[in-house]
Each structure stands twice: as C-alpha cells, then as structure tokens.
A protein has these predicted regions:
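Charged, solvent-exposed interaction patches on well-folded alpha/beta domains
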Residues: 3-164
C-alpha cells in the first residue's frame, strides 16, 4: 500500500481510498509470472495487466511468494533488478525483458533491439543515454545490439550498434 485516505461524511459513513504501489516488473518462476513493485514486494501472480512491464530472467530465484520481497538471490542482484526496473519505469521505457548473465551484466530487450548495459556502474547515465537515443528515433526499424556498457565512464559519449 502506497497510501490511504479516509473521508468521513455527515451521514456517518466512511470512505477509505487505498493507493497501491505501481507494478514495475515481473519475474517468471516455476511456470508462473509474479509482479513486483519498486520495493521488491511481490504484488500479484499470473494476472493480465494493461501496462507493459519488463520480465526479469536469468536470475536464480529460490523462492518467490506473494506479498513478500523477492528472495533467494544475492542482495546485490536484487538491488540491481530493482534499480534498473525503477529507472526504466521513471523514464517510461517499456522493456520486453531484462536478463543478467553469470557476471551480473544486464541486457534489456526492446523489440528487435537488445541493449547491453553491462554492470551496475553508471546505470543512471546509461539509461539517460538510452532515453536520448530512443527519443532521436535512431533505432527505428533496426535489429541488433546496442552497446552501452561503457557509457558514463568518462571515456566517450558514443555508443556502438551491432546490426544483425
């Protein structure tokens, strides 16, 4: 619950208005899809939602339970997942999926384009650069991998796109 408000009326009735935290991501685990909020709490299971949220895979969850925080992964990976899904949500980027390899390097899928983000370092800068690229329309109609692993490290502001 993000917030609640109570309204009292003269006829002695009470109206309670509850606002939930928005769902910002999903996890596929044991043939189910679990949806979580920006704090990592699992809010729903196997529902149809109107908004597009990224599906996280590539992480080794040992337990996912409704109304509890995502568990069973290294806390640093859980923090990375939450940071990335929150940045995507805040910047209104609708990723199809998010995956992590064994070195905890993040890759997001945006239709036919995969975006290799690398490690958690400078993730805010990487997402800002991705926003600028998406806004420019440079990726429209392309298929391949956009490399932003080194973005924000001070070495260069350019990026590499490998066409398929």
């Amino acid at each position: 619950v993000a917030s609640y408000r109570m309204e009292f009326s003269p006829d002695l009735s009470v109206k309670v208005i509850v606002t939930e935290n928005p769902i910002i991501g999903a996890v596929s685990w044991e043939h189910n899809r679990y949806y979580f909020d920006r704090y990592g709490y699992v809010m729903a299971k196997n529902i149809d939602i109107s908004s597009t949220v990224p599906v996280v895979d590539g992480s080794n969850f040992t337990n996912v339970s409704l109304y509890e925080q995502l568990g069973g992964v290294k806390s640093s990976l859980a923090e990375d997942i939450l940071q990335l899904t929150q940045l995507l949500d805040d910047n209104e980027i609708a990723a199809d999926s998010i995956s992590y390899d064994e070195k905890m390097q993040a890759v997001i899928a945006l239709g036919d384009v995969k975006v290799s983000l690398g490690s958690r370092d400078n993730m805010t800068d990487k997402i800002a650069e991705l926003c600028a690229i998406l806004d420019s329309g440079e990726l429209s109609g392309l298929k391949g991998t956009l490399h932003l692993e080194n973005c924000g490290d001070g070495s260069t502001s350019s990026y590499i796109f490998d066409r398929e």
